[in-house]
Amino acid sequence: SNHPRLIEGAKKMMDKRGFGMSSVRFICGTQDSHKELEAAISDYFKTEDTILYAACFDANGGVFEPLLTDQDAIISDALNHASIIDGVRLCKAKRYRYANADMADLERCLQEAQEQRFRIIVTDGVFSMDGNVAPVDKICDLAEKYDALVMVDESHSAGVVGATGHGVSELCKTYDRVDIYTGTLGKAFGGALGGFTTGRKEIIDMLRQRSRPYLFSNSLAPCIIGASLEVFKMLKESNELHDKLVENVNYFRDKMMSAGFDIKPTQSAICAVMLYDAKLSQVYAAKLLEEGIYVTGFYYPVVPKGEARIRVQLSAGHNREQLDKCIN
């Protein structure tokens, strides 16, 4: 978020195009830079087309209702993000929920949904509370077996997971097997705001015609577009930032485990330090803040009872001195 190239990209685009668009996309809110960013996202995810939203909450809220009817089925992971849950609620499709990353339970749901016209499996790429990665390759195997579409929310995985940070499809080798991706420009891709849906062209075309958050929300501001374009240029030029992130995550996790802490297994930048006691998680977070370390204590109802933890979000911007201060 503080990288000088992003800040300069935002400034240049605002100087060139102004502060805001004052319109939705289909009236007079589309500039060539919006199309350029959509093309950059498609290139990054190896997809055919992309549609931009004001936030990923809007992307997830606007993806199901245009595509599915009461004759169809949505099969959703139990730990999917709230935006997916709300998007499913806006749709008349029959709903199934399977236990987190449980392929046997997913198969049970798919078998039950065989009478529906279309089926879509929906999962986070990385689950935001635990930091675990969805087994997207196995999900795709079941989707092919039971003739279902696959949708992955890459908000917590894109830019982080995979050999070069291209997300779960790079990690699981599932390019061309995932039909729809959603994601955010508010985490690894700049940290401000903005969301997107990317995938097969016919799906994106339908969303452009019928997705209400896209049709009735103002376009992303030029400064967001300018910074986001710079993000994808940087990621294409070098893997340095991703490599630094992976180094930081591995160092922090290994040192914390050596110190006796219980850390949820993860390949992501989310490190859940398990404390299991709600009050203790609040006290720990408050004491760390007094030391200049900003972390968040999570407890019921955000996480299940008895699963209280501190969630540490690492970035490529952290240096070794900062990590050691937190660990010690």
Spans of features found by a protein language model:
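PLP-dependent enzyme catalytic core of the Aspartate aminotransferase-like
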Residues: 12, 16, 39, 43, ...
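Active-site C-terminal subdomain of aminotransferase-like
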Residues: 146-149, 156, 161-267, 280
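Conserved PLP-binding catalytic core of the aspartate aminotransferase-like
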Residues: 1, 243-252, 257-292, 302, ...
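Short, structured coil segments at secondary-structure junctions
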Residues: 70, 90-92, 146, 177
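Conserved N-terminal alpha-helix of the aminotransferase class I/II PLP-enzyme fold
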Residues: 7-56
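Conserved PLP-anchoring active-site segment centered on the Schiff-base-forming lysine
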Residues: 63-82
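Active-site phosphate-binding strand-loop segment of PLP-dependent enzymes
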Residues: 96, 100-152
